[in-house]
């Protein structure tokens, strides 16, 4: 579940940052990275559009992209992405995975995914079956054998 407050797109992305301290360049960049720009242009108030309680007016994929924009905006050293693209179409997922690849070498990413395309860029993969690690290594050694 993605935590969305009953507030604007901007405040949901920069969650926890006082309005006067929001870095608008970082906000715009995180919107671009999460592929939200087209959606936001269609919204009546742009980044100032109210999302409603729990983002009720958004699809699952749109809520995921708000969460990704938040992760990109806050620029943490470690990002945990648990099925972060599961509700996205394959084209949008591919675009976002390309953005995530750009973080390689600068961030520690822990990616939990069922779609193999999501983890293809990872340095190290753990394959878990019934709660146990059954394989580990790079993409080719873990997935290539299946």
Model-derived segments and their meaning:
Residues 73-77, 106:
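A short, proline-enriched helix->beta-strand linker immediately N-terminal to the Walker B motif
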Residues 10-53, 97-98, 106, 135, ...:
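ABC ATPase nucleotide-binding domain helical subdomain, centered on the C-loop/LSGGQ "ABC signature"
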Residues 90-91:
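Helix N-cap at the start of a conserved alpha-helix in ABC-type nucleotide-binding domains
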Residues 68, 112:
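Hydrophobic anchor residue at the start of the ABC signature
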Residues 102-111, 119:
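Conserved catalytic loops of ABC-family nucleotide-binding domains
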């Amino acid at each position: 579940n993605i935590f969305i407050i009953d507030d604007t797109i901007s405040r949901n992305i920069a969650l926890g940052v006082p309005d006067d301290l929001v870095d608008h360049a970082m906000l715009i960049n995180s919107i671009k990275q999460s592929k939200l720009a087209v959606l936001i242009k269609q919204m009546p108030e742009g980044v100032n559009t109210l999302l409603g309680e729990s983002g009720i007016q958004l699809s699952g994929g749109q809520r995921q992209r708000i969460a990704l924009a938040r992760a990109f905006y806050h620029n943490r050293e470690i990002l945990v992405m648990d099925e972060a693209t599961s509700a996205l179409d394959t084209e949008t997922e591919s675009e976002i995975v390309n953005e995530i690849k750009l973080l390689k070498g600068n961030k520690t990413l822990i990616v939990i995914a069922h779609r193999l395309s999501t983890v293809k860029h990872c340095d190290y993969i753990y394959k878990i079956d019934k709660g146990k690690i059954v394989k580990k290594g790079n993409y080719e050694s873990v997935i290539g054998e299946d």
